[in-house]
Amino acid sequence: MNKVKRKKIMHSQVALQIAVFILCALVVYPFLTLIIKSFKDYEQEVYSPITFTFPLHFENYEIAWLYVKNSIFNSFFVSISISVMCVLLSAMGGYAFSRFSFKGKEIVYSLTVALMMMPSILILTSKYVLVSVTFKMYDSFLGVIVPQAAGLVPFGIMLLRGYFDSLPKGLLEAAEIDGANSAVQFIKITVPLSIPMVMTLFLMNFMTSWNDYLWPLMILHDEAKFTISVNLQSFTDYFYKMNQYYAPALAGYVIVSLPILVLFGFTSKQFIQGMTAGAFKM
């Protein structure tokens, strides 16, 4: 029986490893193809589209950088602004729902969380009219930042409230006895204890904002204000119409992927800590 069990376990492990390998290959292959094609010229792209060819055309990256460098800085500004605004509002909202008791609290919380269930496409037109006509924020960074941050806040409140509820109540009670008001408890106790979850929320919002395409496309008109997703699509269409190949545009996609990869590489530990902490504590 033991031998039979060991064989079953070994077979299941082998099957699991094969499945993981296949999934990893499916994830890595498109990005690897993107890198390979970004070094080609027209003839190499046509006749050897998915294999390495020589010479490597690094000038594709020079062309792409000249076109996307301004929009990279725009995207950094927009993504960081959205992430910071969302984290601040979510932390304050989550803390209020976690620590304070007021009439209708659970109803308000349920309505806030219910906003996540509404497909964003349903309110796209009304949001556009509100931002561009009512608040006169068309073709401005504020028109991109404020609505996107507001849309991410309900999830942040839900995430942080669950984490705040799990923190030791004794620490806050002791601080209250020592004379610390709610603001001091929030700034000096709750937030420092919640850094992994706060960092996780920041990273999730940053990646969402960095990759967002539809809303910046609708709001921004001046090319100097384009975010990277909008600018890359414009660059891809323009370059292909003029030259009939995609390599410099693909080089642009590689360039704009690097900040996310570097950011995640340096913060993956905090990201995983926050996700696992949230899984156990929510």
PLM ranges: what are they?
Residues 6-282:
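A structural signal for multi-pass alpha-helical bundles of membrane permease subunits
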